[in-house]
Amino acid sequence: PLVSATTAISHELGRPLNGLLVRKEAKDHGTGQFVEGLGNFKPGDKVAMLEDVVTTGGSLLKACDRVRAAGLDIVAVCCILDREEGGREKLKEAGYELHSLFTRKELVEMARS
């Protein structure tokens, strides 16, 4: 939903962005690909990874691996919520800086105020 909304809004604003969907499991129907939407990109294109919630970072790292294996250059890794359960550190070890809109601590503090 995040990627679909982002690409739709970008087109409405006249600054179109293409999007990819990275699956946890390849489907046994359709294209059967882990990464959908590659036809909109060429090798070496720069992409940003967008995730709703990062916990340990494992799923996001796997998605990054699949996108890089497809020949794309990841220039940003972003999420809405970093649950602060090791994901940021794990991503940093892999060479990615995580940009989050909120951390768990920030949301808890806002809820208490």
Task: Map each language-model feature to its residues.
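Ordered, amphipathic secondary-structure segments that act as subunit-interaction surfaces
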Residues: P1-S4, M110
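PRPP-dependent phosphoribosyltransferase catalytic core
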Residues: L61-S113
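Short, glycine/charge-rich flexible loops or terminal/linker lids adjacent to PRPP-binding catalytic cores
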Residues: V3-A48, G58-L61
